[in-house]
C-alpha cells in the first residue's frame, strides 16, 4: 500500500477492515495505555509529544500521550484519554476512539495498549510543562512509511532486541513509539 496519498477515509477503512491480531504473549503485568491521536484532516496528521527533559524515565523522547492505568480509570481506553488530557489538554469527549492495537511490552515493565483515536484539527492542545516539552504534528502518511524506520539490535542484560529509529524534522523517533507506528502501518496493510 502506498501511503503518499493516504486520506483519513482510506486510513479509517483500512484500520477497520483489518482487525488487530495478537502477535505474541506479553510478559508484563503492569498496565499502561497511550493515545495515538490522528488529526482529522483530508490528509490526516499524527499528534506526538516530546517528553520533558527533567523526567526520570524516557526524558526528552518522542512519545504518544499516555501512561500507567490508575485506580480511577474504568478501562485502558479511559486511561489513554485521561493521560492525553493531562499531558496535552485533549478533552476525552473530543476523541473518537476507533480501536486498539495489540499491547506492547515496554522495557520499564509495562504492558502498553495503544488506543487509536481521531481528534478535531482545531483543538488548542498545549503541553503540560510537568510532563511534556513539545507537541507537534507529523503527517500520518509519513509516519506510516515503513522505509523511514531503521533497525538497531540492542543487547541488554544478555538479551538482544530490535528497536526502530527514525527522524522527523529535528525530532528523533525511536523505541516504543517507532515500534507502535510500524505496527499501525502493518495493521492498515502497508507492506515492508
Curated annotation (Swiss-Prot):
Cofactor list: Mn(2+); Mg(2+)
Residue span(s) of domain Nudix hydrolase: 29-160
Keyword Phosphoprotein attached: no
Binding site for Mg(2+): 83, 87
Keywords attached to this entry: Hydrolase, Magnesium, Manganese, Metal-binding
Enzyme Commission number(s) from the entry: 3.6.1.-
Motif Nudix box: positions: 67-89
Function: Probably mediates the hydrolysis of some nucleoside diphosphate derivatives.
Family: Belongs to the Nudix hydrolase family. PCD1 subfamily.
Descriptive protein name: Uncharacterized Nudix hydrolase NudL
Organism from which the protein derives: Salmonella typhimurium (strain LT2 / SGSC1412 / ATCC 700720)
Originating gene: nudL
Amino acid at each position: 500500500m502506498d501511503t503518499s496519498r493516504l486520506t483519513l477515509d482510506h486510513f479509517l477503512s483500512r484500520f477497520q477492515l483489518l482487525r488487530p491480531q495478537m502477535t505474541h504473549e506479553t510478559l508484563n503485568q503492569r498496565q499502561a495505555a497511550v493515545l495515538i491521536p490522528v488529526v482529522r484532516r483530508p490528509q490526516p496528521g499524527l499528534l506526538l509529544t516530546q517528553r520533558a527533559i527533567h523526567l526520570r524515565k524516557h526524558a526528552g523522547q518522542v512519545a504518544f500521550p499516555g501512561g500507567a492505568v490508575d485506580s480511577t480509570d474504568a478501562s485502558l481506553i479511559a486511561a489513554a484519554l485521561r493521560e492525553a488530557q493531562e499531558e496535552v489538554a485533549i478533552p476525552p469527549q473530543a476523541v473518537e476512539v476507533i480501536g486498539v492495537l495489540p499491547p506492547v511490552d515496554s522495557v520499564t515493565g509495562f504492558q502498553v495498549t495503544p488506543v487509536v483515536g481521531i481528534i478535531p484539527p482545531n483543538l488548542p492542545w498545549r503541553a503540560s510543562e510537568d510532563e511534556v516539552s513539545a507537541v507537534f504534528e507529523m503527517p500520518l502518511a509519513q509516519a506510516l512509511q515503513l522505509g523511514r524506520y531503521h533497525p538497531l539490535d540492542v543487547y541488554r542484560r544478555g538479551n538482544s532486541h530490535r528497536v526502530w529509529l527514525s527522524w522527523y524534522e529535528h525530532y528523533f523517533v525511536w523505541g516504543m513509539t517507532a515500534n507502535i507506528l510500524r505496527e499501525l502501518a502493518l495493521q492498515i496493510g502497508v507492506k515492508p
